Design a protein with these regions (language model features):
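Electropositive, gly/pro-rich neighborhoods at or near active sites that engage anionic ligands
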Residues: 2-169
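Histidine/lysine/aspartate-rich catalytic loop segments that bind and position anionic ligands
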Residues: 167-194
Length: 195
């Protein structure tokens, strides 16, 4: 695992290049190159996350929408601030220039669908209703069991730093209760604030 120093920047082109390489590898390994991907958007908030009691999710407040890509029978999703419909082969999507948020969301949703199809992940769609709160607790437990405690006394490891990509309110609440958390988000309303 490569660990970066705290002040070291992350090159998004490098990250997407790595993801592109993996998507192309999976495309070859599973014979998906010519397989058509159909991206439908926007999913309604109810289709995307159900009807959770908490109403501060960006898709509910209207700041984001969700794309869904389907590869064979596997679906993958990605949040975006640019809505649209799209249809292309997995190979075309894997090689397209990622010049705007719509294209990046199509790429991410397709990658999520492909890794789901390949059996590398069990879930590639957003959880619904009250599941985001349960999911945050499960993620918190998973992190604590593997990385989060300094010793057997269950003292939180206050040196553990967690990065959350995208504004996920319940996950942020759960992680911030025990750890140092940084959140990246494209929505300027979420930048620089404390939640």
């Amino acid at each position: 695992m490569n660990v970066r120093e705290p002040n070291e920047t992350v090159d998004m082109d490098h990250i997407f290049g790595t993801l592109r390489s993996e998507l192309l590898r999976l495309t070859v390994d599973f014979g998906l190159g010519a397989e058509e991907v159909v991206v439908t958007t926007p999913l309604t908030p109810t289709e995307a996350i159900g009807n959770p009691e908490d109403r501060d999710y960006p898709i509910i407040t209207g700041r984001e929408t969700m794309l869904q890509a389907v590869v064979r029978d596997a679906a993958g999703q990605a949040f975006t601030d640019m809505a649209g419909e799209y249809s292309a082969s997995v190979q075309e999507i894997a090689n397209m220039p990622l010049t705007n948020n719509f294209r990046r969301a199509v790429f991410a949703a397709t990658l999520n669908a492909v890794v789901r199809y390949a059996g590398l992940v069990d879930v590639s769609r957003h959880c619904k209703d009250e599941a985001p709160r349960r999911c945050a607790e499960e993620v918190g437990t998973w992190i604590a069991e593997r990385f989060g405690f300094e010793d057997e006394s269950l003292t939180p490891n206050n040196d553990l730093r967690i990065l959350i990509v995208g504004f996920q309110p319940r996950l942020i609440e759960r992680m911030a209760a025990s750890y140092h958390v940084r959140v990246t988000d494209l929505d300027a309303a979420n930048v620089g604030g404390e939640h």
